[in-house]
Amino acid sequence: MKLNKIEIKNFKCFENESIILHPKLNILMGNNGTGKTSLLEAFRILIGSLYLAFDKYKEKIEMPGIVKDDIRLKTVSKSLEPQIPTNVSANAVVDEVFLPTPEQPYQLFDNNEITWLRSMETFGGKTTTRDAKEMFAVSKKIQEAVRNGDEVNIPLVAYFSTDRYKKERRDTDISKAGSRMRGYFNALDTTTNTKFFLDLYYTETLDEIQNNVAS
């Protein structure tokens, strides 16, 4: 899956912004306070929509949403007022194996493209998912493929916030026979979980040695 374009409205410091992405590599450059981290947080919400239909494992696979601190503030008559709705939307190319089937009740774009939008329409309200039906269908396809044991490549997701180096998340519960979806545990969390990674690596390596099968 590759993101082609994102659009954000009333998100953090951005009133209305549209960004076209390079298919290979994208680098954000700018002075402090120009919105680089804000853009990454918008990406985090959009990519998190991939989790819409995933099985939830003790809140380790969490779908981030728009929060009150994400809403752009504007000076109006000498006061700061939140500007809503706050929207983040994206267009992406999806591997054909994960595309929704033709009988789905919505229209796919051409060239294996999907689009989705997340929004906060009232201050402090919930982040909407009604305009993310295409991504929900892709998410469902991925979960079904994993559940059925299909040999398919699924998207790699990793988010590294500027706070990860100083915030350590403490939880365990890594089992040898865990789901393949463990690879998504805490992937979009703003904290670091070194122990989780080491435990996961240990159990997968041990299983590979003992059973002589690729992990």
What are these model-predicted stretches?
Residues 207-215:
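A short, highly charged nucleic-acid-interacting micro-segment common to nuclease
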Residues 1-202, 214:
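P-loop NTPase switch/coupling surface
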